[in-house]
């Protein structure tokens, strides 16, 4: 007998068609995080990023994270992605570029700062964003999301017993 764990080693459901009740016990272990590297107050009516695909509709606080399509953050998520900052869902705005993405953190004004953690996949507080959520937005599967995270993104293993 052999076992082929595949994506289950990351605690992700291999397929929604699997009926084995044990698949419901899988818990995601992969997290994808970044940190805020810049904060900027932007007036109403300003177009952001390449092509100005997003325009502010009010004075806004915009955060930059050093994560883009070169890191595996699919460009087709532009203006459709939400991330977690301080446990609050915040929209990504403008086009995702090769090395950076912009976030509208206006609702966190006065509570957000440089270096704050941003969760792309994972849990923060009581809120979670899953690889399946991103896959649904792109019309694909969770495998494509997690295997698309490029080698530019550092990998850290936590809770591994090295003895």
Residue ranges of each PLM-predicted region?
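Active-site anion/phosphate-binding pocket segments in diverse small-molecule metabolic enzymes
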Residues: 1-163
